[in-house]
């Protein structure tokens, strides 16, 4: 019996599918629709087994639904802007555009050889002007709705990639791509107002019945809803300031209060801007990133002021006021009260500066003489050493009672807070979507007229410069809008913006005039099955949920808030990986075993690779 010839059969049917557009998708209201989507790939040049596994899962599901007489949409595209293309272009002396387009051609050929049931007529690429002209329209629409704004703020600065990172892109205090220790830097930045939807993003997680619990928990923790209290601490030692307000989730530990810590950007800092010691301290603080991970890993340092803060529960209890590197201005009010016995960060700070450490919470199985020793006690228990709060259980009873007393005395009020910060979207790089904004001679924001979109990236540019290559493009920067001389914004958009709405563009990929076709979107959306990595839980997946709401708010014809009905996180393909000393990754066909020895070499250079 003749062996089954895979190649012959594959070639035959793939040609048939292509010629007859077997997988072309169109609206058919006589059938149930099924929108299957895998997270689209970054065109690195070659597909790997992770891609193959991901797209095979989607292919099997799409074919199954087709056999079940569903009308299936199964598209493919390319997440093609980003820093890696810029870096690779530098290394290979190519333009990012050429490097990206060549990689797309290679990967598309590879994907087609897999015989996937993809509607290639809906193919998109985020670096094409046909895609990003619509993204620029969306930006301007959201700006008009108040969901985009610009402000000066501290940002996470990657000193290797020389760009800003969102909090979600900082992992263990390091840049998610470069691995460099992140620094704090103050810049004018553009932001999406994702915090406007904090409660809705949180509460709607309960409706995502076909999402993994792990992903929902990660998003819940990232949004970080907390219940606490705003407290006004009276201040002594200042002629100009009578009180400082702070937000805390633990007002029940006020009797263990031993210092008040302020951000270096707190309004109080203006009184120290000519103090040389404070100037040096502030510069030292810039070495710490803006994420919780960066702050947690940093050595805690403080600058002591001549001020004292008064405990609202005890007028005779006065403590020093410090500026500290672990307090950020964008959380609460840029001020925190320190209770070293029951917060490890406060404990480290108090130990360093020899401040009082007073125990006010004991474990349930300890007596009232319990004292902490070498570390803070942060568990549940019972309040002690706290006068009228003694005996209340921690945390629920004690916190409620503390807030009640503060409100009765007019010293504080209950407050709900969210950990989720607005999404910083400015990036100091060339290979990204240009922001459709300019500035007049008085630095006022001027929108690029929609009739002049897209704002295209200049070509034939030298990208081997330090910092943002667009800053050197003077001719490109200067333009006239409504008779006014203006200068273009040189930052580009975070590439996560590109992937936050691509699932919508697939629905009307061939509509050149409009970014959305409401009829197509209302038919195909939401995505019935989304497939991709769990590593995107608090990045792409959260951003996409925000974007869907923002677009819904801007377009009354689109009645949808959740983009993905079902989510499957496929896991990792675990096998040997290969990289060199410079952290460049290699495919298996680019390395060889050195005659059976326990190491591999790069084919082209014979250099050793690290096997992981």
Predicted feature locations:
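Catalytic alpha/beta core of large soluble enzyme barrels
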Residues: 58, 71, 266-363
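Conserved oxyanion/phosphate-binding beta-strand-loop segments in alpha/beta enzyme cores
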Residues: 1-37, 66-75, 99-108, 210, ...
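Residue patterns forming the tRNA-binding/recognition surfaces of aminoacyl-tRNA synthetases
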Residues: 3, 12, 16-20, 91-244, ...
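Short, solvent-exposed turn/loop segments enriched in Gly/Ser/Thr/Pro and often Arg
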Residues: 30-31, 40, 75-84, 123-131, ...
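Conserved active-site neighborhood of enzyme catalytic/cofactor-binding cores
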Residues: 42-73, 171-176, 280, 331-362, ...
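Amphipathic alpha-helical
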Residues: 194-226, 257, 263-302, 451-479
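Conserved catalytic alpha/beta cores of large enzymes that bind or transform nucleotide phosphates
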Residues: 282-306, 315, 360-363, 388-396, ...
């Amino acid at each position: 019996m003749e062996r089954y010839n895979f190649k012959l059969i594959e070639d035959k049917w793939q040609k048939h599918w292509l010629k007859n557009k077997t997988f072309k998708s169109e609206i058919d209201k006589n059938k149930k629709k099924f929108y299957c989507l895998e997270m689209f790939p970054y065109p690195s040049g070659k597909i790997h087994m992770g891609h193959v596994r991901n797209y095979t899962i989607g292919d099997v599901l799409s074919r199954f639904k087709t056999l079940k007489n569903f009308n299936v949409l199964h598209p493919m595209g390319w997440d093609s802007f980003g820093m890696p293309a810029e870096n690779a272009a530098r290394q290979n002396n190519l333009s990012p555009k050429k490097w990206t387009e060549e990689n797309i051609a290679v990967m598309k050929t590879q994907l087609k050889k897999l015989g996937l049931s993809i509607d290639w007529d809906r193919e998109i690429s985020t670096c094409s002007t046909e895609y990003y002209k619509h993204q620029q329209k969306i930006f301007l629409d959201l700006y008009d709705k108040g969901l985009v704004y610009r402000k000066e703020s501290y940002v996470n600065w990657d000193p290797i990639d020389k760009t800003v990172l969102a909090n979600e892109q900082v992992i263990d205090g390091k840049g998610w791509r470069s691995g460099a220790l992140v620094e704090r830097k103050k810049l004018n930045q553009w932001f999406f107002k994702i915090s406007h939807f904090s409660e809705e993003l949180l509460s709607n997680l309960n409706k995502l019945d076909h999402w993994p619990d792990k992903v929902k928990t990660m998003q819940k923790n990232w949004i970080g809803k907390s219940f606490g209290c705003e407290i006004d601490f009276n201040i002594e030692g200042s002629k100009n300031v009578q009180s400082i307000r702070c937000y805390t989730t633990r007002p029940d530990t006020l009797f263990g209060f031993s210092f008040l810590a302020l951000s270096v950007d707190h309004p109080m800092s203006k009184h120290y801007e000519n103090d040389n010691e404070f100037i040096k301290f502030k510069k030292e603080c810039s070495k710490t990133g803006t994420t919780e991970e960066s702050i947690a890993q940093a050595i805690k340092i403080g600058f002591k002021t001549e001020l004292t803060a008064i405990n609202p529960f005890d007028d005779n209890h006065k403590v020093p006021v410090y500026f500290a590197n672990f307090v950020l201005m964008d959380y609460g009010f840029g001020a925190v009260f320190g209770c070293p016995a029951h917060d490890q960060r406060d404990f480290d700070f108090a130990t360093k500066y020899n401040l009082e450490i007073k125990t006010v919470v004991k474990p349930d199985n300890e007596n009232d003489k319990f004292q902490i020793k070498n570390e803070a006690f942060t568990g549940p228990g019972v309040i002690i050493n706290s006068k009228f709060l003694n005996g209340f259980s921690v945390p629920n009873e004690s916190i409620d009672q503390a807030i009640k007393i503060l409100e009765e005395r007019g010293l504080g009020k209950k407050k709900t807070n969210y950990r989720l910060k607005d999404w910083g979207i400015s990036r100091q790089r060339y290979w990204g979507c240009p922001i459709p904004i300019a500035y007049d001679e008085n630095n006022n924001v001027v929108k690029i007229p929609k009739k002049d979109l897209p704002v295209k990236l200049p070509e034939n540019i030298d990208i081997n410069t330090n910092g943002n290559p667009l800053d050197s493009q003077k001719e490109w920067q200067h333009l006239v809008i409504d008779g006014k001389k203006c200068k273009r914004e040189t930052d580009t958009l975070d590439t996560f913006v590109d992937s936050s709405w691509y699932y919508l563009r697939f629905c009307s990929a061939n509509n050149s005039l409009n970014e959305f076709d409401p009829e197509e979107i209302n038919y195909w959306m939401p995505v019935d099955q989304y497939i991709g990595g769990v590593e995107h839980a608090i990045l792409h997946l959260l951003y996409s949920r925000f974007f869907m709401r923002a677009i819904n708010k801007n377009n009354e014809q689109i009645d949808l808030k959740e983009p993905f009905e079902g989510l499957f996180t496929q896991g990792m393909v675990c096998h040997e990986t290969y990289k060199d000393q410079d952290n460049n990754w290699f495919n298996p066909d680019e390395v060889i075993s050195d005659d059976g020895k326990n190491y591999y070499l790069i084919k082209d250079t014979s250099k050793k690779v690290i096997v992981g």
